């Protein structure tokens, strides 16, 4: 039994306790279905002279088809190292599709191969990401406990960036505990924060891709230009609803 009052659940994506808490207390009632992505990351040591420290590169599209959401990032670090990442939404249609194989194919693109050829992988990893956005975010407080970070789903999906929002929820939770000594009221507190406003601005970008890559890119451009001021909020759909049958 957990005796602390309140308890902060910071398990990350799809945590065991978090899933039980969401179900038991109905924290996702009235929310859009949560959606997920799978990301791979590799740290490469490259031959001297190829890196441009501070450069960040993003791609969309190939080797993914226009119906599959995903893309890549390359962070140029110091000491002739780069961090290469590839993320695929788990709402893909083809049941035979392999995100890992797509990542390997991506590295054979002439531009990427030219960067990595002759290099060495120093470390690698994979993890799931929560992509549902603020419309899929569950209530973040319950009797005796709170959700923070990826346990709730505070990733800024278009930027593939969530450390800052996770830290923000943690700081808000700590402040709330110090000031009130309880969990109740934390959800309302966080939703009035700058981090919540940031997620609200980009809420329509990820579900907009459900209609295809090109319409999704047009929608993303609109949402960016307007600062997310569209008078509508697009709903997400469960990832498994997109999967075709064999």
What are these regions (language model features)?
Residues 193-246:
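Ferredoxin-type iron-sulfur electron-transfer modules and their immediate structural context
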Residues 153-159, 175-216:
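Active-site-proximal substrate-binding core of FAD-dependent oxidoreductases
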Residues 15-17, 91-93, 134-137, 154-156, ...:
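Flexible loop/turn segments at secondary-structure boundaries
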């Amino acid at each position: 039994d957990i005796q602390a009052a309140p308890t902060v659940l910071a398990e990350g994506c799809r945590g065991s306790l978090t899933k039980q808490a969401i179900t038991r207390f109905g924290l996702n009632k009235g929310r859009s279905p949560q959606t997920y992505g799978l990301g791979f990351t590799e740290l490469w040591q490259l031959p001297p002279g190829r890196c441009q420290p501070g450069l960040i590169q993003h791609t969309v599209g190939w080797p993914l088809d226009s119906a599959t959401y995903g893309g890549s990032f390359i962070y140029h670090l110091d000491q002739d190292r780069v961090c290469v990442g590839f993320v695929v939404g788990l709402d893909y249609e083809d049941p035979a599709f392999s995100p890992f194989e797509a990542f390997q194919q991506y590295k054979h693109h002439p531009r990427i191969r030219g960067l990595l050829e002759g290099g060495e992988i120093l470390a690698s990893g994979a993890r799931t990401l929560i992509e549902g956005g603020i419309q899929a975010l569950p209530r973040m407080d319950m009797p005796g406990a709170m959700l923070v970070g990826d346990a709730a789903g505070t990733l800024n999906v278009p930027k593939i960036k969530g450390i800052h929002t996770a830290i923000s929820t943690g700081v808000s939770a700590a402040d709330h505990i110090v000031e009130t000594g309880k969990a109740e009221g934390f959800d309302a507190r966080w939703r009035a924060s700058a981090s919540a406003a940031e997620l609200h601005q980009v809420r329509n970008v990820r579900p907009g891709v459900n209609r295809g890559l090109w319409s999704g890119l047009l929608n993303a451009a609109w949402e960016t230009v307007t600062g997310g001021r569209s008078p509508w909020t697009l709903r997400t759909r469960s990832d498994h609803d997109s999967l075709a049958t064999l």
